[in-house]
Swiss-Prot record:
Homodimer. One of its GO terms (molecular function) is 4 iron, 4 sulfur cluster binding. Pfam families: FeS_assembly_P, ParA. This is Iron-sulfur cluster carrier protein. InterPro entries: FSCA_dom_sf, MIP18-like, Mrp-like_CS, Mrp/NBP35_ATP-bd, NUBPL-like, P-loop_NTPase, YlxH/NBP35. Binds and transfers iron-sulfur (Fe-S) clusters to target apoproteins. Can hydrolyze ATP. ATP binds at G125, K126, G127, G128, V129, G130, K131, S132. GO terms for biological process: iron-sulfur cluster assembly. The keyword Iron-sulfur applies. The lineage of its organism: Bacteria, Bacillati, Actinomycetota, Actinomycetes, Mycobacteriales.
């Protein structure tokens, strides 16, 4: 009878562990082969051994807490002890095959015909218009809705995404597969996670292309609903590489109301004419500063966002909407410096509502059927 009870308890514990999600891979630890052993005592004490992917796993404390909490909630258990071990090279190889398939060369999942991930390349003409701020806030707002979101900091020379997302974690590497850190429920990858301190990255075009290719192919993104790429300003090497590596990526153009900035933003959007990309819309940032008396000061002028949308619509022969106008507010700057996007810290503010509205519009869109395999054979009846 004791053996039966122990077997029932072990089964209940394993079921509970099946609900423990690995914080990096976002899959149950039982499915990933991370449960090494479960031992129970006659008094209900439990000893669970867990495999970590690498010895210096940055999430080992979080995994231990999740396992302990899950086992402690199982009826009939008393004291819970969790021990950690490390996967062997063979186990890591099997894990990589399980996640990525037994492919010799990594592929870019978002460029495959059957990919359902929406890819938005956030572009601007000039620097300093708030492109990265818009990117992180849209990502966080989408994640709040329960979507699986990733952000790729493609601005290699001017990287700022980790700081604005409040993460200093480094990626975990399992063989050639890179596991991106997660901040505010968003997967984040940036060259800043591979450099020391504020070291500048001094690379030319071919190196930039290779880095972008590795971020897209070697990083294990999982099943994303939306991937946001924070592009560098202008129409240089990275923008061209994105069009080559992910032809289905759609452009989101960020500008300020200033006409000079709008003209440059128009050039950044017009790259779509040469790369055959779709422009999903325009976002106007720093639209106006609300004063204490309720009036609005147009610090950077007005009309730039609408002008860009109208001119791009004429250029591409399709509607390019002005998706939103984000007010100028020091709180948005402070939120970026603190590492907590404003859509999370002040969701009910005017800026928060506008950003959430833009995110809603982008989240509810579905990828078109162009380039996708429908699994139909016209020769069969």
């Amino acid at each position: 009878m004791s053996g039966t009870r122990d077997g029932d308890l072990n089964a209940a514990i394993r079921t509970a562990l099946g609900k423990v999600i690995d914080p990096e891979l976002r899959r149950p630890i039982t499915e990933l082969g991370m449960v090494k052993s479960i031992d129970t005592g006659p008094d209900g004490s439990v000893h669970v051994e867990i495999y970590l992917t690498i010895a210096g796993c940055p999430k080992k404390s979080e995994i231990t807490e999740r396992v302990t909490r899950a086992v402690a909630d199982v009826p009939g258990t008393s004291a819970v002890r969790v021990s950690l071990d490390v996967m062997s090279d063979e186990q890591r190889t099997e894990l990589r095959k399980q996640l990525r398939g037994d492919t010799r060369e990594p592929v870019i999942p978002f460029a495959q015909p059957d990919s359902l991930t929406r890819v938005y390349a956030v572009a601007s003409g000039k620097g300093g218009v708030g492109k990265s701020t818009v990117t992180v806030n849209l990502a966080a707002a989408m994640a709040v809705r329960g979507l699986s979101i990733g952000v790729l900091d493609a601005d290699i020379h001017g990287h700022s995404i980790p700081r604005m997302m409040g993460t200093t974690d480094r990626p975990t590497q399992v063989e050639s597969m890179i596991l991106p850190p997660i901040a505010h429920q968003v997967k984040v990858i940036s060259i800043a996670q591979f450099t020391q301190g504020n070291t500048p990255v001094v690379w030319r075009g071919p190196m930039l292309h290779r880095a972008l290719q590795q971020f897209l192919a070697d990083v294990y993104w999982g099943d994303l609903d939306v991937l946001l790429l924070d592009l560098p300003p202008g129409t240089g090497d990275v923008a061209i590489s994105v069009a080559q590596l992910i032809p289905n990526a759609e452009l989101l153009v960020v500008t300020t109301p200033q006409l000079a900035a709008a003209e440059v933003a128009e050039r950044a959007g017009s790259i779509a004419l040469q790369t055959r990309q779709r422009i999903v819309g325009v976002v106007e940032n720093m639209s106006g500063l609300t004063l204490p008396d309720g009036t609005t000061m147009q610090v950077f002028g007005e009309g730039g966002g609408r002008l860009v949308a109208e001119r791009l619509s004429r250029a591409v022969g399709a509607d390019v909407p002005l998706l939103g106008q984000i007010p100028l507010d020091p709180a948005l700057v402070a939120a970026g410096d603190s590492g907590v996007p404003l859509v999370l810290s002040s969701p009910d503010s005017a800026i928060g509502k506008e950003l959430h509205s833009i995110a809603d519009g982008l989240s509810t869109r579905r990828r078109g059927l162009a380039g996708m395999s429908l699994g139909l054979d016209p020769t069969r009846r």
